[in-house]
Design a protein with these regions (language model features):
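Hydrophobic alpha-helical segments
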Residues: 1-152
């Protein structure tokens, strides 16, 4: 598959700023392991092979188990994820899919039981970032398997 547009080359300033925004999230209230889980799930939902490959590699670098990585797509039926992780995955899925009726108070309340307002805010920015990268990479057919860089 040939990449349609090298967006980093064509829009270098926007690319750098979007990357800086994404990197800023690494120091947020959301721990690296949760960032990895959420990023993987969002990229699964969006069908972004490039991003999924990158996030899985990053999670492995951070010590995530192969068993849990294999269970992320079925997290709702798995007993391998904590209540906090389930809340974050719920919020990630709902903001990625954006149902016509919006986010129910029930879902919000269940998520808020596990995440502070600051954590939920940081998580929401993370979700927006991953969705943005997914859409760019899917649209321009960025090939997966190219990233081998170690964690920064």
């Amino acid at each position: 598959m040939t990449q349609r547009v090298n967006f980093a080359q064509q829009s270098p300033q926007l690319f750098k700023k979007f990357l800086a925004f994404t990197n800023e999230l690494i120091g947020s209230t959301i721990e690296a392991s949760l960032i990895d889980l959420v990023s993987i799930r969002i990229s699964q939902l969006n069908g972004c092979d490039f991003c999924l490959d990158m996030h899985v590699k990053q999670a492995a670098i951070h010590g995530e188990s192969e068993l849990r990585l294999n269970e992320i797509s079925a997290w709702q039926d798995s007993n391998l994820f904590t209540t906090r992780e389930r809340a974050a995955l719920t919020w990630s899925e709902i903001l990625t899919k954006l149902p016509d009726q919006g986010v129910s108070d029930d879902v919000y309340d269940r998520v808020r039981e596990q995440l502070s307002e600051k954590e939920l805010s940081d998580l929401s920015f993370l979700i927006a970032s991953v969705n943005g990268w997914d859409r760019i990479n899917v649209g321009f057919k960025t090939a997966s398997g190219r990233l081998t860089r170690q964690s920064t």
